[in-house]
Amino acid sequence: MAPNIRKSHPLLKMINNSLIDLPTPSNISAWWNFGSLLGICLTTQILTGLLLATHYTADTTLAFSSVAHTCRDVQYGWLIRNLHANGASFFFICIYLHIGRGFYYGSYLYKETWNTGVILLLTLMATAFVGYVLPWGQMSFWGATVITNLFSAIPYIGQTLVEWAWGGFSVDNPTLTRFFALHFLLPFMIAGLTLIHLTFLHESGSNNPLGIISNCDKIPFHPYFSLKDILGFLLMLLPLTALALFSPNLLGDPENFTPANPLVTPPHIKPEWYFLFAYAILRSIPNKLGGVLALAASVLILFLCPLLHKSKQRTMTFRPLSQLLFWTLTANLLILTWVGSQPVEHPFIIIGQLASLTYFSILLILFPLTGALENKLLNY
């Protein structure tokens, strides 16, 4: 019998073992679709970004005009830009749901996969931040100024570090140039990290909603999950194109239609919606260094998840108390997101402080305690 090239060719064999003949748990739900959706997001962002980069000029005098030129004069330039800007939002929606799934179903117990995933999230956040600066509107400029300035809170080396990052004494042309270079480079770094993430995942195999070993009941990835993933792509690309075509500026800030002006500060400086929860935590602490540490901790706390797991069961499927806590945390994050978009005044200050406190309390104290309590309840 002739050898099957799909199973004998060195390169095709790798693809086959990752996407075609991969043994997959038969009971994984739609929550397991977000990994492939993130892959589609990354591909879309790299393609649209590449096309935008061919028409973009990384210079303070020309950046804003070059983006306007892309939208007005380039064939379908407006569409490419709208897909790229809103594609970032969908990227974050998918990654947050993907992390939520991992947290709910105890996927963080695959430590290497989880840790590379958190590194991927941090890289994505960095990419989105430097990308937001490129159109060189008011919010681009002031967002870059405020967020990079946070590094000056680091004792002893802070100020030097910030001036080194800026390439001068304020956000200016050198900053824009290096941010463009970083924004071009980082997505390819994300692609590389994704391969590492997948390599670690395929070492252990996928988790499943029951959190039990599924070796006795596996099915091939293709055609079952390849088809399921295609349905997922369609269900994501539909709202993305709808948003890009009908209300492309819905999630943006009107302030960014004004070219950057270092002499005029916008009344409310705020990041894109997907950073608002972290921004609210940053603002809730009246001390600069304390705020920066809390901001960093709000994301880095994910690294602690495997260490804080105290339950005998892996998933929350049969743990009603942990489920209640999980959805409280979800509501808490939505409150933080809302507070982050509001001005710094009463009652938003106190709401933000309480929400920040509960965020850390739930993750660091209540989840491990509830896990231990549920173990006790199992014995009754």
Curated annotation (Swiss-Prot):
GO terms for molecular function: metal ion binding; ubiquinol-cytochrome-c reductase activity. Keywords: Electron transport, Heme, Iron, Membrane, Metal-binding, Mitochondrion, Mitochondrion inner membrane, Respiratory chain, Transmembrane, Transmembrane helix, Transport, Ubiquinone. Heme b b566 binds at residues 98, 197. Binds 2 heme b groups non-covalently. It is found in: Mitochondrion inner membrane. The chain crosses the membrane at residues 34-54, 78-99, 114-134, 179-199, 227-247, 289-309, 321-341, 348-368. Component of the ubiquinol-cytochrome c reductase complex (complex III or cytochrome b-c1 complex) that is part of the mitochondrial respiratory chain. The b-c1 complex mediates electron transfer from ubiquinol to cytochrome c. Contributes to the generation of a proton gradient across the mitochondrial membrane that is then used for ATP synthesis. Its cofactor is heme b. This is Cytochrome b.
